[in-house]
Amino acid sequence: MYTLKEGIDFYIEPMQSKKVTVFDTTLRDGEQTPGVSLTSTQKLEIAHQLDKLGVDIIEAGFPISSEGDKESVKSISNAGLDTTVCGLARVLKKDIDACFESDVGLVHTFVPTSDVQRIYTIKKSREEVIQLAVEAVQYIKDHGLKCMFSAMDATRTDPEYLIEVFKAVQEAGCDIINVPDTVGVMVPSAMYRQIKGIAAEITIPIDVHCHNDFGLAVANSLMAVEAGASQVQVTINGIGERAGNADLSQTVMSLTSIYGAKTNIRTEYLVETSKMVENYTGIRLPPNTPVVGQNAFSHESGIHSQGVLEKSDTFEPGIMTPEMVGHRRRIVLGKHTGKHAVKQSLESAGIKTNDNQLDEIVIRIKEIANKGKQITDADLYAVASAVLGKASSEEELIKLKEVSVMTGNILTPTAVVKADIEGKEIIAARTGVGPVDAALHAVRDILGESNHFRLQDFRIDAITGGADALADVYIGLENEKGRIVTARSANPDIVMASVEALVNAMNLLYKKENKS
């Protein structure tokens, strides 16, 4: 057990002295995500962003796959980036030549080594596979470039044969070997044992490439580093073939924040980079995506949000803050929200309330949330404005009790309003050109002869998107003396929002007349 931050202990072995190289394959394996096709311009922009992020190696593409891909890799190679640009190649001279023509600084060559892939895809014997691998490595090294060799489907390859392959390419001059979990079948404990066994036999650096078919890509990558790997292959947002690859943000933040390892990643650009790739690929992240997702540092529960507001370490990792990854902390308002969070959110916007007003705002927020509505900041401020704009209960002339409306294509819109006026229950019914018009006429009628005002302003805004948008109604009333008051109300029901706004305005007018 060791401590990275005071009061927070971790039951793992630390890696403060270990440096891990980050190999990003978003532009190669990531682009193989079903439905994703990036333009050359987009790939170049992503490459610049990855360089800004600080990745050590960018696998820019598979040059032999198409002339367009080769030109894209070449443009990235010649973009003046600080990172090393890599091209993928099978153990074939034509593939490797395409990498040379793309001006890459590293060639990543591969060949299947598992029996199932070797027999059914390339139809070669074990001996022939070793010969192809060695010849490819030698060809790359003879041209003065760095070489990484991948034993494709390594995690389903006979362990003794795999070591034999790696020893052969190491002797041929390979700079680094890659152990790919090509179909994502490893579990962390098995990954640890495999990498530990390879590290005991091989002296050159070990890289891992983990797929996420069972959701274990990040965990397997971390176990590989624990066992001796010094380089991890990752993609932005975990995109890639099938279920994707190890996610860069999750892998890097786990390595640096939990293990204490070092990388060259400038973590403050993680969210920015994630959003760029999200926009260009069209693959939207679930809100609960770790590190970079919308909810990664969001809190709704009253207990959680109050704890975070007092001290963020209470219900956040503590060793990873939103600022570290370019994110921001959000207190999300909803049906689980407590008064503390609502008060904090209001005060951050300069809105002060007394206890009664705060109680009513919380009640309204929860009423809206219980209808399945997500509460935004705009919703909160509209609700707060409606509550703060009301007269206090003891100064209310009108206490609204009930509103009902009928409308349809063969019905005349009709509204019935029930309210208490100075302790007396009044009911009024009116028709109108629509349900809102009918309801407002009915509200005015409940005052009878005391109805000495005119509607000076009336505005309705949908302050949030969607069919369930919150209606924000603003009303201006003017009495016979020229006194003007304004009031507003917010409600998912546009009729109720309109009625509440008018009643609020009428009560404010009554309050001001009594105090004048």
From Swiss-Prot:
Keywords on record: Amino-acid biosynthesis, Branched-chain amino acid biosynthesis, Leucine biosynthesis, Transferase
Keyword flag Transmembrane helix: no
Record EC number: 2.3.3.13
Biological processes per GO annotation: coenzyme B biosynthetic process; L-leucine biosynthetic process
Domain of life: Archaea
Pathway this chain belongs to: Amino-acid biosynthesis; L-leucine biosynthesis; L-leucine from 3-methyl-2-oxobutanoate: step 1/4
Keyword field contains Transferase: yes
Recorded catalytic activity of this chain's protein: 3-methyl-2-oxobutanoate + acetyl-CoA + H2O = (2S)-2-isopropylmalate + CoA + H(+)
Molecular function terms from GO: 2-isopropylmalate synthase activity
Alphabetized Pfam families for the sequence: HCS_D2 (PF22617), HMGL-like (PF00682), LeuA_dimer (PF08502)
Annotated ranges, domain Pyruvate carboxyltransferase: 20-271
Function: Catalyzes the condensation of the acetyl group of acetyl-CoA with 3-methyl-2-oxobutanoate (2-oxoisovalerate) to form 3-carboxy-3-hydroxy-4-methylpentanoate (2-isopropylmalate).
Recorded family membership: Belongs to the alpha-IPM synthase/homocitrate synthase family.
Protein name in the entry: Probable 2-isopropylmalate synthase
Organism name: Methanosarcina mazei (strain ATCC BAA-159 / DSM 3647 / Goe1 / Go1 / JCM 11833 / OCM 88)
